[in-house]
Amino acid sequence: MAAYLEIEKVIGREILDSRGNPTVEAEVYLADGTVGRGAAPSGASTGEFEALELRDKDKSRYLGKGVTKAVENINTVINDCLFGIDASDIYAVDAAMIKADGTKDKSNLGANAILAVSIAAARAASVSLDIPLYRFLGGVSGNRLPVPMMNIINGGCHALSSGLDVQEFMIMPVGAPSFKECLRWCAEVFHALAAILKERGLATSVGDEGGFAPALKSDEEAIETILQAVEKAGYKPGRDFRIAMDAASSEWKSEKGKGYYKLPKAGTEYTAEELIEHWAKLCEKYPIISIEDGLDEEDWEGWKKLTDRLGDKVQLVGDDLFVTNTERLSKGIELGAGNAILIKLNQIGSVSETLEAIKMAHKAGYTAISSHRSGETADTTIADLAVALNTCQIKTGAPSRSERVAKYNQLLRIEEQLGASAVYPGIRAFNVNND
């Protein structure tokens, strides 16, 4: 008979994230004395349909960003509703909190409160059962290490002083033989890029996610600079590394309204069809394998056209489009919008709902990418999640800043634990034609 891991108490506290803003940390205590801890991350560019992060809005504390209400909800309502529940049944744990919240977007108790507790309960259960978190969440089938999607140049709203409209330019080490080696490759390219930027007299200070934010003039210049860094580090673009981009184009609002896009920095205006052709030309010119949020989160018709145009050879990732939400993902699958989903725990607000979103994506042939937020903590749950459900890709910043590197270091440990059964998929992590 399986052990019943009774929850005895839950406590919350206000801690700081990597941007110096408050966030929620929770601890779940089991009757056997085990403790699990979890923390909620926070995003800078947030999708309109994300679960609600509860903030105090008291301007006298942390500029209104305090989370004492969310913490109080953990110490009272959540503590009461989880008393006596089995922590190993993550669906029951999350269902109890969602029922106590009573809203669709978790705005009553706060998605940040619910998520921190959801992670803490899963961790407590895995510790009590003496198994790694990835095994607890995914069973014995989780053995694939993810290919990193490393953000090394920032643009858009992550780098307001540059001329780059695309929010993130990333490298993906598709030709590496193992996770340990892929991490080395990426670090070497990162340092080669730093050297190139220094030679040009450009800034090498890092942004929220560890990437550089140099004053480059255009998106194409950013791509070409990255390819130069790949070669300088001794690798071959296309074979060893592919490029991924996060356009975050829901931020590109035009006065002309829906179906139109205006690049805030370049000033160029596009219709959805013109923007699709812009992406197609970039993909023909450069070894781009993935584009995230290439169109607005409500432009479903445009997304279908984009997928028809590029979906057979480029990974088209919905972040703001799907917000880790099974209802929106289901609509996308039905329409043929995109072919991949970015998985962010705090967009939906619980571990069990995140697992369901990944399972739904995989069932429909979509790839899933385990992702961080720009405001992160030392919590490494997304690393375990990537292996648990074989997402095969992870997006968690540059090989710089300890809250980003913590996830990569956890994946190194997992690869070591898995030993001979560990698989690094490389180019096979994608569901597109890679000829």
Curated annotation (Swiss-Prot):
Molecular function GO labels: magnesium ion binding; phosphopyruvate hydratase activity
Cell compartments where the protein resides: Cytoplasm; Secreted; Cell surface
The keyword Cytoplasm belongs to this UniProt entry's keyword annotation: yes
InterPro entries: Enolase (IPR000941), Enolase-like_C_sf (IPR036849), Enolase-like_N (IPR029017), Enolase_C (IPR020810), Enolase_CS (IPR020809), Enolase_N (IPR020811)
Active site: E209 (proton donor), K344 (proton acceptor)
CC cofactor: Mg(2+)
Annotated S-S bridges: none
Biological function: Catalyzes the reversible conversion of 2-phosphoglycerate (2-PG) into phosphoenolpyruvate (PEP). It is essential for the degradation of carbohydrates via glycolysis.
UniProt protein name: Enolase
Phylogenetic classification of the source organism: Bacteria, Bacillati, Bacillota, Clostridia, Lachnospirales
